[in-house]
Amino acid sequence: MNQYAVWGNPIAQSKSPRIHQLFGEQTGKSISYVAKLGNELNFENELMQFFAEGAKGANITAPFKERAFSLADEYSESCLLAEACNTLKRLDDGRLYADNTDGFGLCSDLERLGWLKPHQRVLILGAGGATKGVLFPLLKAKQQITIYNRTLEKAVRLAEKFAKYGKIRTASLEQIAEQQFDLIINATSLGLQGKYVPVAAHLLKSAAVYDMQYAPDMQTPFLNYARECGAVRYQDGLGMLVGQAGFAFKLWENEFPNVEKVLKQLKNEMENAK
């Protein structure tokens, strides 16, 4: 039985063990997947011990993605650009391969929704790790990206780093209000404090609105605000979570699961748990 785990802090809320359990049942793969509360002081030692004991792979979530990145021996292109990994695989020779499947999870969910068309005007809110993890796949999909971040310098540095991969620029809230967008993505963690970026209402009304965070009935602070502004096309990040997990599962087990089927089951379980 192949051993896997997701590492984070906090981690009790993670849906990943359930998602991978469903993937295993669906594909007939014999796997064990557990949640591990990472120790801020000893994370690297704990993770390397996990692999030394024979584990085949691990998912990494906040706040350890950058630290896990530094432990790897080989990297995917998306992982190198993000400078953070959410997926590690132990290779046959014992070395660690690092990937970042967040962006592919996002793009696959946007495709499922019919929201990923070439040359769209996309506004991304935030310039932190979540944004870094998705820029490369979005630019590969020929999205025209504008980044807003409260600290403009951070957004500018990110835009400069990814400029050679496609159209990307930065803007202030005032500049954003004078533009039009086809898709608006919230990649900030403000929702964890019950806050959101106050994007101009007319933009939310006309665009498709996507929040990387998720909640039962899509009741995230940003999506609640978007609905109040008249948004009619909106979605939370549960599909992105299941999607990135699907790409990690494929990396480990060499079989891509039916993501949509698992997403539907997860939504039903969350609905029934209310």
Curated annotation (Swiss-Prot):
Entry EC no(s): 1.1.1.25
UniProt cross-references to SUPFAM superfamilies, sorted A to Z: Aminoacid dehydrogenase-like, N-terminal domain, NAD(P)-binding Rossmann-fold domains
Keywords, ordered alphabetically: Amino-acid biosynthesis, Aromatic amino acid biosynthesis, NADP, Oxidoreductase
GO biological process, one term: shikimate metabolic process
Family: Belongs to the shikimate dehydrogenase family.
Function: Involved in the biosynthesis of the chorismate, which leads to the biosynthesis of aromatic amino acids. Catalyzes the reversible NADPH linked reduction of 3-dehydroshikimate (DHSA) to yield shikimate (SA).
NCBIfam families: aroE (TIGR00507), PRK00258.1-2 (NF001310)
This protein's name: Shikimate dehydrogenase (NADP(+))
Phylogenetic placement of the source organism: Bacteria, Pseudomonadati, Pseudomonadota, Gammaproteobacteria, Pasteurellales
Gene: aroE
